[in-house]
Amino acid sequence: MTEIQKPYDLKGRSLLKESDFTKAEFEGLIDFAITLKEYKKNGIKHHYLSGKNIALLFEKNSTRTRAAFTVASIDLGAHPEFLGKNDIQLGKKESVEDTAKVLGRMFDGIEFRGFSQQAVEDLAKFSGVPVWNGLTDDWHPTQMLADFMTIKENFGYLEGINLTYVGDGRNNIAHSLMVAGAMLGVNVRICTPKSLNPKEAYVDIAKEKASQYGGSIMITDNIAEAVENTDAIYTDVWVSMGEESEFEQRINLLKDYQVNQQMFDLTGKDSTIFLHCLPAFHDTNTLYGQEIYEKYGLAEMEVTDQIFRSEHSKVFDQAENRMHTIKAVMAATLGS
């Protein structure tokens, strides 16, 4: 086996939110993931976690996160064990503290995807092993590594990139893009109706990172201002998990913020890429899509099918990169 050097000594560390790491560490993980992607492509084994056991805790359903952690674990030589919402009793029949102490005795690392940021923080506090946040209502750090890896693959650099997020400014993707982008020296623009502006607490964290690392933060409801000369347009679903009752309200608020060809024309450049963490409502080929069309007459929601399937779209590279970046995090924090 050809050995490769991990980017930094992150052994024993947890990834709970982007600001847990420095700019150098975060970009180091991205570069490490790019290397691991080449290793996988070329069939070079990289069993950094041979003999390790990984707990995958999922309160929320997932396709990409579960698949990425599972394949990443196996590629690294570890054994992943999935524990779904019917298998774990976090805070219900058993406290998070007690659960963490039990799992920490049996597993070498723990992934958590759920609602509460406090839950993932407590898992890390009490388990005694590295814990990785696969998504909470507040932050989505593993997604950020994949997103900025995809941007770096397309442009060759991150510092000075203009990134525009269009949609609900209060969700975890918007929070994480602001903070991770600011840490990496990216100019992050959040384009959202004023009523969906991100909370000041998250904006303040991002602005502090921007002043430290050279990025910038813009919050605006002006689409033309937000996308002018931007390198990447990013959107997410208009309604997050657990908010399904708010579809009509969100559609009314965000229908003018759909990512479409007109928006891309406003960028003034041909090289702008499109990003989405998926799943995306870009057609009626799902039960959800059909239901939305029947209720509200919308065949496309946050992005048009034209843009989703265009050469601008890097969403499937982005999805693949979840696996490579998650692998980098696990190997760097748990590997030997």
From Swiss-Prot:
GO molecular function, one term: amino acid binding
Catalytic class of the enzyme: transferase
Pathway: Amino-acid degradation; L-arginine degradation via ADI pathway; carbamoyl phosphate from L-arginine: step 2/2
A Gene Ontology BP annotation from the UniProt entry: citrulline biosynthetic process
Entry keywords, A to Z: Arginine metabolism, Cytoplasm, Transferase
Pfam families xref list: OTCace, OTCace_N
Record PANTHER family: ORNITHINE CARBAMOYLTRANSFERASE, CATABOLIC (PTHR45753:SF1), ORNITHINE CARBAMOYLTRANSFERASE, MITOCHONDRIAL (PTHR45753)
Protein known as: Ornithine carbamoyltransferase, catabolic
